[in-house]
Amino acid sequence: DIGNNEFVAIIGGSGAGKTTVMNAMSGFDYDISGKVYCNGIDLRKNFQSLKNIIGFVPQQDIIYENLKLRRMLEYTAQLKMPPDTTKGERDERIQKVLQMVGLEERANEYIRKLSGGQKKRASIAVELLADPGLFFLDEPTSGLDPDTEKSLMNTLAKLSKTENKTIIMVTHTVQNINLCDKVIFMGPGGKICYCGKPDKMYEYFGKDSLVDVYSELASNVDMWNMKYLMLYKEQHLDKNTEIPEVNENEKISDMIKDSGKKTSPLKQLGVLTKRYFELVFNDRQRLLLLLLQPFIIALLLKVVAKKDVFKIYDSTQSIMFALACSGIWIGLFNTIQEVCKERPILKREYMGNLRLWTYILSKYIVQAVVCFMQTTILTGLFLVLMKHAPKKEQVLPTPQLEIWLTIFLTIYASAALGLIVSSCVRNSDRAMALAPFVLIIQLLFSGVLFELKGAADKISYITVSRWSMECLGNITNLNKLNMKVTGMPHEHNDLYNRGASHLTNTWLILFLMMAVCGVISVIVLRNLK
């Protein structure tokens, strides 16, 4: 049993199940037996109603390093606090939270410039915005030096008493465990061996040091687990202690007040989009790289392009294929790490009131701007450098604009594909490891290197490269161009049939692919755990 405003530490060796127990207690892990009660309310049964009064800080930081601390808290406050909260009230809450964690003087610094301990305090500040009564922290002192660890422990102990928070944390370090009100010691196999005051722990085990306690539990965990269960039975079960019956609906209503109200979808989308814009444009080095890529690629395409591009079949098909592949790589590189690198933050916000479709749509909106700039640089410079140009437009005022739109849709659809990959994996390394595989599929089923027949033709329907090349072949009228060797005919390719309706329909297919990729990304992310 954990009382109100208690500061509790769950300790034990690696693999003892500390985090598993905390996840079960917090209600974030449904795959458990038994029940957890919060003020007499079944937490698992009423988790959707109670989750807004629960703060949870995972081991990874849940903050964006490319935002200033105050800006990070402002965005989070707009997402977490009741929708009718005024800006003045949000600012007041942010200032109070900064004071709670001792970061007032760091409020206007970029989070990436904060120390490890300060970043952990910033993560705690993010959760404090919603004023939760129950707080869970997973390894908050991991990787901190002794002085920083002591400072953080003092902050947590102060929060539990002065701010009326019940704080439960998992930790390996015990130098300042005396600041806790209660310690839960877990032995191998997830067996609880002690639950009580920290100053009584060594006396309970009959040992003088933590190392001796670990050694004792490694060899006699069942005995100590049995002792704990017997004591628990004597203190609680033999006294017929029961969970008091409460009117859950009334109790929940009293506990959550206005915290359960959700921000409107449009407002949430606006906040997420504005935040993502700021993140992208604050990362100047990466943004420069994203815009430098199409510039360099356009120059390289000019270097390898022959003078008879748009005049001769071989040269035109090759350079259009290179242009399409360049667009695919640029789009994929834009987003393949965008979701997985934010996974801890996304998971925590989704446990709150974040709508996944607004999250993905905010990515689409910002990426549309980035893709627009990249397309303009790539196609604009490439077409200016070319000696010749396609001769006749079909849908737009000029064939150059038709090529621009095709490459824009190619880059954008590839960025949407990158979001799927990023949604499926847990870290950036795995995402980048999958990038070559995705690109190889685009190369094989583009219809340029190999003839598409049977299964290959069907697979090509889900590739960006096939539809991109179909558009470019249509615009440049490949079927009507001559081979380099005079008099040598080339086989007519139905993919490159010229026609305004054919071109428009192919553009629509690329647009539809973007929409489908967005839906798939949302579905994949619904399995966040």
Predicted features, each with a name:
Residues 1-6, 13-14, 33-38, 80, ...:
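Topological signature of polytopic alpha-helical transporters
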Residues 26:
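Helix-to-loop junction immediately C-terminal to a conserved catalytic motif
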Residues 60, 65-82, 93:
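Q-loop/switch helix immediately C-terminal to the Walker
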Residues 135-138:
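Catalytic Walker B motif of ABC-type/P-loop ATPase nucleotide-binding domains
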